[in-house]
Amino acid sequence: MILLQATTTTLNLIELQSRVAKFDIKNFKILSISVDPENDTQEVLRNYISSMDIDSSNWHFLTGAVDEIYDLVQSGFKLSVGKDSSSPGGVYHSSNITIVDSKGYIRTGLDKKKNVKYVYDGTLFSDVKLLVGEIQRLSNTNFKDNYEIYKK
């Protein structure tokens, strides 16, 4: 999820994209979903992509109806989002990143202590490094591996 005022996650995703590119993973994509579609028009998103110098060859910015976005975020990804006048942009949202595989499953991974990670904190560079490893691992393994699989 993305709120255009939240640049830390975007900068970390730029780094993630750069690191994953070194492995030449064919089906890797980043999807950023605007949680403020009333303000984040297609033109605003295009300007944001340009101003942040984002490589949009495999990074897509999505928007839609507020109700549908909030339902997808809350029910599909199990992340928080909502309106809050005291939050930047009047919207609160999770800064977490999830991995969704080619079959539509939300994938878990392991942290350095071998604890299961359900989401990755988009504001932490240490989680970006974990994401790179998980994405590389998923690109090299069979769909039926020994990790937890949760249908989104």
Enumerate the predicted regions with their spans.
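Thiol-/selenol-based redox modules, centered on thioredoxin-like
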Residues: 86-152
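Solvent-exposed coil/turn segments that connect beta secondary-structure elements
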Residues: 1, 33-38, 54, 65-67, ...
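Short, internal strand/loop/helix patches
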Residues: 46-94
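Stable alpha-helical elements in mature extracytoplasmic
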Residues: 9-12, 41-44, 69-72, 127, ...
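Sec-exported extracytoplasmic/periplasmic mature domains
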Residues: 18-22, 50-57, 74-78, 105, ...
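Envelope-exposed proteins and targeting segments
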Residues: 26-31, 57, 93-96, 102
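Conserved long hydrophobic alpha-helices within structured protein cores
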Residues: 8-12, 70-75, 96-107
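Membrane-embedded segments
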Residues: 1-48, 52, 59
